[in-house]
């Protein structure tokens, strides 16, 4: 009986950290890899790569914990989130706080193996991860904060590799914010009706009938910024072809969200994993002289 209870608790922690749903970690991973490959340029040192990959999964898990902690009073009123570990009682508030601290401490121990500039930047990463979940109560632009949180690994990666944050770094950071606002608006379109009822704010609500148009403009901005980064760094044809493919994926997403159906909007959100992957493969091909 005791093992059963322990096993159930571990499964609840597993669900709370979303380790059963890797899409969020992947959307955080791809920009991190973009930055590491451009900053190096090429393949980064194995230890730095390992620290950032592990950090992505740990901090994404920590972000999910604090997000559910912040939303614990709201999630029970939304059909999609009512069975999450905190509102369902599978995990207590005290356990959630302890889990968050453990995940952050492990992440920070990894960062301590890097240079001073990266360590200092990691403090801002923690602040963004903590602040984001509460923004949806006060502003219709929480997706912008999410983009900054998901993209802060970009200046950290540049700092870890070169102890500098050049123009390419900040252009990539901006591109990631635009991308995050676009894909998280698609995600927010799934819950828009529920969010309006319980007072949660989002760009999906703010954009209203112009949501598809604004998402399209943001996606064009992402492609333009990534093309500029390619020009600044002398990247090859493989990279530019990846931008073309990413553009085709964005067009497909526009088709999916055309009627604003929940399942289709969620499918469009999930499709962004391929956008990140394609752009990374383009970078890799360019540096490997394909």
From Swiss-Prot:
Q: Name one GO cellular component term.
A: plasma membrane
Database matches in InterPro entries: HB_polyprenyltransferase-like, Prenyltransferase, UbiA_prenyltransferase, UbiA_prenylTrfase_CS, UbiA_sf
- The reply to whether tRNA-binding figures as a keyword in the UniProt entry is no
Q: Which reaction does it catalyse?
A: all-trans-octaprenyl diphosphate + 4-hydroxybenzoate = 4-hydroxy-3-(all-trans-octaprenyl)benzoate + diphosphate
Q: GO molecular-function annotation terms? A: 4-hydroxybenzoate polyprenyltransferase activity
Q: Which Pfam families does UniProt cross-reference here?
A: UbiA (PF01040)
The annotated topology with respect to the bilayer is: Multi-pass membrane protein
Please give the cofactor(s) recorded in the UniProt entry for this protein.
Mg(2+)
Query: Its domain of life?
Result: Bacteria
Membrane-spanning residues where? 23-43, 46-66, 99-119, 141-161, 163-183, 213-233, 234-254, 268-288
Pathway(s) per entry: Cofactor biosynthesis; ubiquinone biosynthesis
Which keywords describe this protein according to UniProt?
Answer: Cell inner membrane, Cell membrane, Magnesium, Membrane, Transferase, Transmembrane, Transmembrane helix, Ubiquinone biosynthesis
- Main enzyme class: transferase
Q: Which GO terms describe its biological process?
A: ubiquinone biosynthetic process
What's the EC number here? Answer: 2.5.1.39
Q: Where in the cell is it found?
A: Cell inner membrane
Family to which the UniProt record says this protein belongs: Belongs to the UbiA prenyltransferase family.
Matches recorded under PANTHER family: 4-HYDROXYBENZOATE POLYPRENYLTRANSFERASE, MITOCHONDRIAL, PRENYLTRANSFERASES
* Purpose of the protein: Catalyzes the prenylation of para-hydroxybenzoate (PHB) with an all-trans polyprenyl group. Mediates the second step in the final reaction sequence of ubiquinone-8 (UQ-8) biosynthesis, which is the condensation of the polyisoprenoid side chain with PHB, generating the first membrane-bound Q intermediate 3-octaprenyl-4-hydroxybenzoate.
Q: What is this protein called?
A: 4-hydroxybenzoate octaprenyltransferase
Tell me what organism the protein belongs to: Escherichia coli (strain 55989 / EAEC)
């Amino acid at each position: 009986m005791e093992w059963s209870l322990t096993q159930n608790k571990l499964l609840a922690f597993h669900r709370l950290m979303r380790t059963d749903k890797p899409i969020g970690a992947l959307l955080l991973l791809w920009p991190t890899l973009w930055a590491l490959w451009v900053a190096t340029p090429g393949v980064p040192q194995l230890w730095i790569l390992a620290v950032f990959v592990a950090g992505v999964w740990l901090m994404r898990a920590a972000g999910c914990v604090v997000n559910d902690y912040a939303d614990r009073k709201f999630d029970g009123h939304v059909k999609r989130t009512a069975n999450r570990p905190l509102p369902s009682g599978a995990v207590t508030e005290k356990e959630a706080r302890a889990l968050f601290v453990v995940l952050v401490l492990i992440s920070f121990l990894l960062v301590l193996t890097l240079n001073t500039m990266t360590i200092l930047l990691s403090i801002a990463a923690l602040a963004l991860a903590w602040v984001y979940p509460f923004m949806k109560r006060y502003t219709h632009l929480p997706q912008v904060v999410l983009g900054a949180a998901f993209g802060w690994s970009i200046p950290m990666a540049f700092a870890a590799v070169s102890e500098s944050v050049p123009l390419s770094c900040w252009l990539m950071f901006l591109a990631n914010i635009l991308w995050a606002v676009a894909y998280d608006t698609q995600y927010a379109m799934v819950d828009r009706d529920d969010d309006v009822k319980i007072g949660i704010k989002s760009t999906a609500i703010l954009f209203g009938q112009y949501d598809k148009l604004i998402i399209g403009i943001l996606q064009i901005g992402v492609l333009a910024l990534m093309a500029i980064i390619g020009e600044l760094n002398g990247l090859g044809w493989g990279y530019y072809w990846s931008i073309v493919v990413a553009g085709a994926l964005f067009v497909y997403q526009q088709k999916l969200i055309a009627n604003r159906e929940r399942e289709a909007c969620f499918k469009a959100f999930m499709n962004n994993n391929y956008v990140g992957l394609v752009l990374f493969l383009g970078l890799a091909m360019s540096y490997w002289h394909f």
